[in-house]
Curated annotation (Swiss-Prot):
Residues 22-296 form the Septin-type G domain. It comes from Bos taurus (Bovine). One of its GO terms (molecular function) is molecular adaptor activity. Residues 89-92 are annotated as: G3 motif. GO terms for biological process: cytoskeleton-dependent cytokinesis; protein localization; regulation of exocytosis. It is found in: Cytoplasm; Cytoplasm, Cytoskeleton; Cytoplasm, Cytoskeleton, Microtubule organizing center, Centrosome; Midbody. GTP binds at residues 32-39, 66, 92, 171-179, 229, 245. This is Septin-1.
Length: 367
C-alpha cells in the first residue's frame, strides 16, 4: 500500500510566499578613507544611484572634518522580490590631520542599533520590530600602501566583534596582477597576526552541487576582494558594451573576473551569503552583546553604573545597558492595563449574552 500524501512537502512553498510578500531588508556599512571608490562601488553593486545629491567638501575643509554617520535607503525590486537596502556611510573617516579615536562614532552607532533592537525585543509590543542592525561592513583598504595601516588595524580591532567585516581593496586597477596578489597575502597575514576576525564563510554541505562548491572556493580565495567600480558603459571593440573604465592602455571591465573580484563580491553579498550574514549578526554578534548586557545588569550596582555611563558616554567600548525611561515604561503599562480592561468587559458581555440565550432556550423548552 502506498504511503498517503499528507502535504508537508508544501512547507517550503509556504515559507517562500510569506518571505516574498514580506520582503527582505539588509543594512550594509561602508567604511574607509575618502577617494577609494566606496560610493561608486555601491552604485555598481546594486545598479542604483544613492549619492546623486552628495556634495564633496573642499580639500581644505577635510583637514578638520569630523566623521559623520549617514544612512541612505532604497527599495530594489527584481523578479518580484523586494529588498529594502540601507547603506550606512562614514564620510570623514581618516580624513582629518588627527585621526585619534575617529572610529569611535562608528562603534557607538553599531552598538546603538543593538541597543535599540534589544529595547524593542524586550518591550511589550513586539509585532513590528524594525531591524536596523548593521549586517555587514565593507572596509576599504588603500591599494597604494603596503598592507594595513595603523588606522586600519585600530578600526578593525574596535568593530570585529560587533559586525561582519569584509575587507575590500579599493581601486584595484591601480595594481598589476602580481602586486594585487602580494597585497592580498600581506593583508591576510596582518589580519591573522593582529587576531582580527573577519566574516567566515560557512562550510558547504556535502549535497551541494559542484558548481556552487567551486564558486564558494573562488570567493574564499578572493578575500580581500580587489574591486573596481564604474557606472559608465564603454565600448572596447567587443560585441557588446560593458561597464568599466577606459584608459590609454586599455579598458578595465568591472564584471570581468580576470580584471577584478567585483563579480565574486556581488555574488557573495547578494546571491549566496546575504541570509547567512543576517543570521550571524543575530545569532552570534547580537546574542553576544545581549549576553554582556544581561551579565552587567546581574552584577551588584550595575544599574547605577549604567545610568552613569549613559550620561557620560566617554567610551564607545562601554556596554550601554538598554533600560526604558520610566515615563515610557509607565505609559506602556497603562496602555496594557487599558487593553486588559477592555478585554475583560468584552468577556463579561459575552458571558451575559450566553447566559441570556441559555435562559431563553430553557424557557422555550418548558413551553
Amino acid at each position: 500500500m502506498d504511503k498517503e500524501y499528507v502535504g508537508f512537502a508544501a512547507l517550503p512553498n509556504q515559507l517562500h510566499r510569506k518571505s516574498v510578500k514580506k520582503g527582505f531588508d539588509f543594512t550594509l556599512m561602508v567604511a574607509g578613507e575618502s577617494g577609494l571608490g566606496k560610493s561608486t562601488l555601491i552604485n555598481s553593486l546594486f545598479l542604483t544611484n544613492l549619492y546623486e545629491d552628495r556634495q564633496i567638501p573642499e580639500a581644505s575643509a577635510r583637514l578638520t572634518q569630523t566623521l559623520t554617520i549617514e544612512r541612505r535607503g532604497v527599495e530594489i525590486e527584481e523578479g518580484g522580490i523586494k529588498v529594502k537596502l540601507t547603506v550606512v556611510d562614514t564620510p570623514g573617516f581618516g580624513d582629518s590631520v588627527d585621526c585619534s579615536d575617529c572610529w569611535l562614532p562608528v562603534v557607538r552607532f553599531i552598538e546603538e542599533q543593538f541597543e535599540q533592537y534589544l529595547r524593542d525585543e524586550s518591550g511589550l509590543n513586539r509585532k513590528n520590530i524594525q531591524d536596523s542592525r548593521v549586517h555587514c561592513c565593507l572596509y576599504f583598504i588603500s591599494p597604494f600602501g603596503r598592507g594595513l595601516r595603523p588606522l586600519d588595524v585600530a578600526f578593525l580591532r574596535a568593530v570585529h566583534e560587533k559586525v561582519n567585516i569584509i575587507p575590500v581593496i579599493g581601486k584595484a586597477d591601480a595594481l598589476m596582477p602580481k602586486e594585487t596578489q602580494a597585497l592580498k597575502q600581506k593583508i591576510r597575514e596582518q589580519l591573522k597576526e593582529e587576531e582580527i576576525n573577519i566574516y567566515q564563510f560557512p562550510e558547504c554541505d556535502s549535497d551541494e552541487d559542484e558548481d556552487f562548491k567551486r564558486q564558494d572556493a573562488e570567493m574564499k580565495e578572493s578575500i580581500p576582494f580587489a574591486v573596481v567600480g564604474s557606472c559608465e558603459v564603454v565600448r572596447d571593440g567587443g560585441p557588446r558594451p560593458v561597464r568599466g573604465r577606459h584608459y590609454s592602455w586599455g579598458t578595465v571591465e568591472v564584471e570581468n573576473p580576470h580584471h577584478c573580484d567585483f563579480l565574486n563580491l556581488r555574488r557573495m553579498l547578494v546571491q549566496t551569503h546575504l541570509q547567512d550574514l543576517k543570521e550571524v549578526t543575530h545569532d552570534l554578534l547580537y546574542e553576544g552583546y545581549r549576553a554582556r548586557c544581561l551579565q552587567s545588569l546581574a552584577r551588584p550596582g550595575a544599574r547605577d553604573r549604567a545610568s552613569r555611563s549613559k550620561l557620560s558616554r566617554q567610551s564607545a567600548t562601554e556596554i550601554p545597558l538598554p533600560m526604558l525611561p520610566l515615563a515610557d515604561t509607565e505609559k506602556l503599562i497603562r496602555e496594557k492595563d487599558e487593553e486588559l480592561r477592555r478585554m475583560q468587559e468584552m468577556l463579561e458581555k459575552m458571558q451575559a449574552q450566553m447566559q441570556l440565550s441559555q435562559a431563553q432556550g430553557e424557557q422555550s423548552d418548558a413551553l
